[in-house]
Amino acid sequence: MEKQFKLDIHVHTSETSSCGQVSAQEAVRLYEQAGYDGIIITDHYHREYFNSLGNLTWNDKIDCYLKGYRTAKSEAAKGKMKVFLGIEYRNVESDNDYLVFGMDESMLFKEPELYSRSIQDAFACFRQYGAIILQAHPFRKRFEKDKGDFVRYSSMDYPELLDGFEFYNGNKNWIQDPAETKAAAEKYPNLILVSGSDFHHPSHLATGGIILNGNFDPIQEIAEAVRNNEIRELIHSDEN
């Protein structure tokens, strides 16, 4: 029987993501204990983060951005679990987020301020470096006090530019409309369905992920397997 590879494609670290509440080292330990074979570190890549770093050069900013990923990778080298590079990308046009992986560190240095580019230009750039693009939590809602209700702030604006989207998102701090998610899967059958924990806090551990057959390294192999829809199972909590 071919080995199964249990992978969470949506993990944040406190070193890089301001909303992250778990260090990269601890995240690796927790996922190893939970029986995962690998995680993709997808810290937030957006204008607000890079502006917060002040007047550093772009290369220095990327070194800061990669701290969570690099720390996690060093920790994973002590055991058997694998850590891969990804980003959760957002540009200045909207609040939509996208999981992007399949490129290596060099792309982040060579292509500055991708958040300032149009979605079309940024996605074309990602693909030039072999990356896959999956929309994160496309139908998420947040509570707005002035309206006294939950309002959707994330939408699938560019389905024709996507490889797939998060059908399951394990982070229950937010509301995602399952009816809209299912409707999108039916409307766009060519899009690959994935699952991610959206890990920020220990309570999010192992609430999402995918299972592939085989053993994967480097990240380009994972991107190719997902692109070819070789996912065997979507991991999700009973609450999803």
At which residue positions do the language-model features occur?
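Charged catalytic cores and adjacent phosphate/nucleic-acid-binding surfaces used
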Residues: 1-17, 21-29, 93-107, 124-125, ...
